[in-house]
From Swiss-Prot:
This is Histone-lysine N-methyltransferase ATXR5. Keywords: Chloroplast, Chromatin regulator, Metal-binding, Methyltransferase, Nucleus, Plastid, S-adenosyl-L-methionine, Transferase, Transit peptide, Zinc, Zinc-finger. GO terms for cellular component: chloroplast; nucleus. SMART domains: PHD, SET. Pfam families: PHD (PF00628), SET (PF00856). The binding to histone H3.2 is unaffected by mono-, di, or trimethylation at H3K9, but is strongly reduced by increasing levels of H3K4 methylation. GO terms for molecular function: histone H3K27 methyltransferase activity; histone H3K27 monomethyltransferase activity; zinc ion binding. One of its GO terms (biological process) is methylation. Residues 1-44 form a transit peptide. A zinc finger (PHD-type) spans 64-114. Substrate binds at M221, R339, Y369, E370. The gene is ATXR5. InterPro entries: ATXR5/ATXR6, SET_dom, SET_dom_sf, Zinc_finger_PHD-type_CS, Znf_FYVE_PHD, Znf_PHD, Znf_PHD-finger, Znf_RING/FYVE/PHD.
Length: 379
């Protein structure tokens, strides 16, 4: 009779023999010794709150910051800290005055890389404003007289109610004086890294031109009449010839860049159109540009448009605003911003509201439509 061998390859699969314990692991000099791991709860229970300590240290280090100009530490809500040197400055102590707390990074005058204002040559000034050649004086006089005759012939003989008409700008007669006036504007724009623009710009990625529809204006928008439209077109052609209103851009240590009359300007004279990039207001809510102008105020906030003269602009961005909280400062207003519907699109025009004498600075109300701009620090 044959006997059964358990080690034989022909062993029965029904055998009840099984391995109940793994063999002991052989020690190896290469493998590290076993480590006991702690749970995350045990680690967090014994950890030190480093972040909170840093925040407390930061608060303590900034609690004694004082203004570098006046030496006072009062008015924490108006004390700006330079993001580079950590020195403090009151907004009203800075020159020029800062009217609102910057949203992004802010650098003091010593740490900022400000471009020095430099004078430009005649060739560079003409190239900056894209003026090809000065028209001869007699040709200009004949052209203006011909335009006047055409406008007189187009007038109706019927008696109408007297209306305040928009007047065309009157440039200085001396061409050298006009060149010097344009030179001050070119130097100011160059110092801020802004390119000259005589119209609205529609940049890809911002608001398209199709979004600029005056019919979307909340409550409606006044339409520029035909006669005033002819005056506007006449002034725009004069701008392209280098015939600008008698204005110069000067730098004031308190107010920054300001616009000053270099000759007399009559009431209701067209000064300039507010120009720049057109964008949706929702895209500029965290923008530090202090010269944003409302173009279209829509019932739907997502369709409200603004003009942003941070990359392209003209002399209109340098005209300062009045202090709405000071009755005396309100008397300085001598021009206004008016929004018109022109060919179904919104446009913003700057117009004189009274006679302006030579040497007088130009001011208008920044809060003419919306009371959103802080002017309590204005002079």
């Amino acid at each position: 009779m044959a006997t059964w061998n358990a080690s034989s390859p022909a062993a029965s699969p029904c055998s009840s023999r099984r391995r109940t314990k793994a063999p002991a692991r052989r020690p190896s000099s290469e493998s590290p010794p076993p480590r006991k791991m702690k749970s995350m709860a045990e680690i967090m229970a014994k950890s030190v709150p480093v972040v909170e300590q840093e925040e407390e240290e930061d608060e303590d280090s900034y609690s004694n910051v004082t203004c570098e100009k006046c030496g006072s530490g009062e008015g924490d809500d108006e004390l700006l800290l330079c993001d580079k040197c950590d020195r403090g400055f009151h907004m009203k102590c800075l020159r020029p005055i800062v009217v609102r707390v910057p949203i992004g990074t802010w650098l003091c005058v010593d740490c900022s890389d400000q471009r020095p204002v430099r004078r430009l040559s005649q060739k560079k000034i003409l190239h900056f404003f894209r003026i090809e050649k000065h028209t001869h004086q007699t040709d200009k006089l004949e052209l203006s007289q011909e335009e006047t005759r055409k406008r007189r012939r187009s007038c109706s003989l019927t008696v109408k109610k007297r209306r305040r008409k928009l007047l065309p700008l009157v440039p200085s007669e001396d061409p050298d004086q006009r060149l010097a006036q344009m030179g001050t504007l070119a130097s100011a724009l160059t110092a801020l890294g802004i390119k000259y623009s005589d119209g609205l710009n529609y940049v890809p990625g911002m608001a398209p031109r199709s979004a600029n529809q005056s019919k979307l204006e909340k409550g409606g928008m006044q339409v520029l009449c035909k006669e005033d439209l002819e005056t506007l077109e006449q002034c725009q052609s004069m701008y392209r010839r280098g015939e600008c209103p008698p204005l110069v851009v000067v730098f004031d240590p308190l107010e920054g860049y300001t616009v000053e009359a270099d000759g007399p300007i009559k009431d209701l004279t067209f000064i300039a159109e507010y120009t720049g990039d057109v964008d949706y207001l929702k895209n500029r809510e965290k923008d530090d540009c202090d010269s944003i102008m409302t173009l279209l105020l829509s019932e739907d906030p997502s369709k409200t448009l603004v003009i942003c003269p941070d990359k392209f602009g003209n002399i209109s961005r340098f005209i300062n605003g009045i202090n709405n909280h000071n009755p005396v400062a309100k008397k300085k207003q001598n021009c206004k911003c008016v929004r018109y519907s022109i060919n179904g699109e919104c446009r913003v025009l700057l117009v004189a509201t009274r006679d302006i004498s030579k040497g007088e600075r130009l001011y208008y109300d920044y809060n003419g439509y919306e009371h959103e701009y802080p002017t309590h620090h204005f002079l």
